[in-house]
Amino acid sequence: MNKKETRHRLIRSLISETTIHTQQELQERLQKNGITITQATLSRDMKELNLVKVTSGNDTHYEALAISQTRWEHRLRFYMEDALVMLKIVQHQIILKTLPGLAQSFGSILDAMQIPEIVATVCGDDTCLIVCEDNEQAKACYETLSHYTPPFFFSNK
């Protein structure tokens, strides 16, 4: 498990087991557990973990907001319809080209969907590299992704 996964696991644990009122409080609890991070990193982690501040009576605290799998699928379909430029399989990888500025959004959605064939996503400004274990898994992943493309996407290819 890498540092980020370890940190995310600890953050989820702290949020579910204790009442955290502020980012600073969460940052202090992480530090007590041996993890020192900047406020910017903590903010990114909280966004990736779908942590939201909720009000309960006079109390405000953070909770994890569950986003259903179908909601992620809906988002992927929406992005595929509006921003997909190219989807191409290359050996054990898939190249997903997007409109400028949207590749990281695709990567976040794919990561959240936890498609079993995807080992990692690496995204720049307009390109998302999807890495799979081998060629067969890349083909299976490509098939899965093609279900979310608009009907006209492959018609001229």
Swiss-Prot record:
Keyword annotations: Arginine metabolism, Cytoplasm, DNA-binding, Transcription, Transcription regulation
Gene3D superfamilies given in the database record: 3.30.1360.40, Winged helix-like DNA-binding domain superfamily/Winged helix DNA-binding domain
Membrane spanning stretches: none
Annotated GO MF terms: arginine binding; DNA binding; DNA-binding transcription factor activity
Pfam family, one: Arg_repressor_C
Highest taxon in the source lineage: Bacteria
GO CC annotation terms, alphabetical: cytoplasm
Pathway as given in its UniProt record: Amino-acid degradation; L-arginine degradation via ADI pathway
Protein localization: Cytoplasm
Gene Ontology BP term (one): regulation of arginine biosynthetic process
Family: Belongs to the ArgR family.
Function noted in UniProt: Regulates the transcription of the arc operon, involved in arginine catabolism.
Protein name: Arginine regulator
Native source organism of the sequence: Streptococcus pyogenes serotype M3 (strain SSI-1)
Underlying gene: argR1
